[in-house]
Amino acid sequence: MDSKKLEPFELLEAGRTDVIFAARQSRVNCDWTPLYYDAMYAILPEDYPVGGRESFPIEEFDGKEFLMPYGRFDIDVNAALSPKKVRPRVRPCHVDDETVIRMVSKGLGITMMTEIMMRGRTQGVRTLPVSPKAGRELGMGMHLSQNTPEEILRLRACVLDFTGGLS
C-alpha cells in the first residue's frame, strides 16, 4: 500500500478523522454502527451453465479463473471463500468494477461482487447470489470514546434516520 494513501480505518485509528463510512473489518476495534448489508453475487458470462439454479455455490469458484476486483475488496472475497477452503485461480484486476464485469462478459473469467458494486452494470453477464449467503456490512465507524462530541452523535442519528429504509 502507498504510505501516502491511508485507508479509512487507518485514518480513524490514527486520529486523523472522527468518522468513517466503510465495510466492516473484523480486525479493527471502533464504535461501529451497521447501516446496510451488501450481499455478494457471482458474476458469470451469460452462457455459463447454471442448470436452473437460483444461487451459485461458493465451492464452484474453486480452481476457476477469478478476476479479483481492485482495491481492498479481496478482504471481503476471501472472507466468503475461506470458510469453505475455496481457492480460485486469482487474477488481480487493477481496473474499475465496470471493466471487470466487461471482462467477465468476454469470457475472461468469473468474479464475485456485492450488489452495490454491480448495480446497473450487469449487461452481458449473469448474476446469482452466492450460497451460502455472503456479503459485507457497510456502516459508520467512530472512535471508541466515552466523550463523543455532540455533533458526531447528531450526525450518527441523522445518518440512521436517513438510512432507516435502505436495509
Question: What is the predicted function of each stretch?
Answer:
Residues 1-27, 94:
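Central regulatory/effector-binding core of bacterial HTH transcription factors
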Residues 4-5, 57, 95-96, 114:
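Short loop/turn segments at beta->alpha junctions
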Residues 12-13, 61, 102-108, 140:
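Hydrophobic residues within well-ordered alpha-helices
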Residues 17, 23-30, 79, 97-126:
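A ligand-binding cleft/hinge motif common to bilobed small-molecule-binding domains
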Residues 30-40, 44-66, 150:
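Flexible hinge/capping segments at coil-to-helix
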Residues 31-41, 111, 115-116, 123-138:
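Short beta-strand->loop
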Residues 64-89, 148-156, 166:
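Secondary-structure junction motif
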Residues 127-167:
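A late-sequence structural motif
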